[in-house]
Curated annotation (Swiss-Prot):
GO MF annotations, alphabetized: ATP binding; DNA binding; zinc ion binding
A Pfam family reported for this protein in Swiss-Prot or TrEMBL: ATP-cone
UniProt name for this protein: Transcriptional repressor NrdR
GO BP term, pick one: negative regulation of DNA-templated transcription
Keywords from the named record: ATP-binding, DNA-binding, Metal-binding, Nucleotide-binding, Repressor, Transcription, Transcription regulation, Zinc, Zinc-finger
Positions of the UniProt region annotated as Disordered: 151-170
Function statement: Negatively regulates transcription of bacterial ribonucleotide reductase nrd genes and operons by binding to NrdR-boxes.
UniProt domain ATP-cone: residue ranges: 49-139
Cofactor note: Binds 1 zinc ion.
Amino acid sequence: MRCPFCGTQDTKVVDSRLVSEGAQVRRRRTCIHCQERFTTFEVAELQMPKLIKSDGSREAFDEDKLRNGIIKAIEKRPVSIEAVETAITRIKEKMQATGERELPSRWTGEAVMEELQRLDQVAYVRFASVYRSFKDISEFREAIDRLESHSVSIPKSKKTAPESKKEDQA
């Protein structure tokens, strides 16, 4: 690796360790020529699939565009940036796991909706209203009904337990 101080190619790795939960390698290096020390970070470069837009054109995956769309949906909602970054990471991992070189842009939109459904239901409805181009209030109602039917319901064990005992005795 080229020394950033003197430009010589002759450097030596002094220390290496994993950082960012194993996603990066941090290396301390020393230049053999000028003796300066510097740090480098290595990250695996993974090729993201290209996105096929509805008009048939192809576009490179743009993580910033994905992030901005999610941030717009969660605006003024109690969702942390860490949660957004985790959602983005999950979407990217799912994209890569498909093994495809190209995916319809619709795939990304659906993946965002799936993540927003986990993060914040209001953000989900906001995103869905733009993504699916809601025309009237009934489409909002349908999205909310879908959310309610897919959300995990907590059993009311205290109320249902005595009733089931009464039914068993009858």
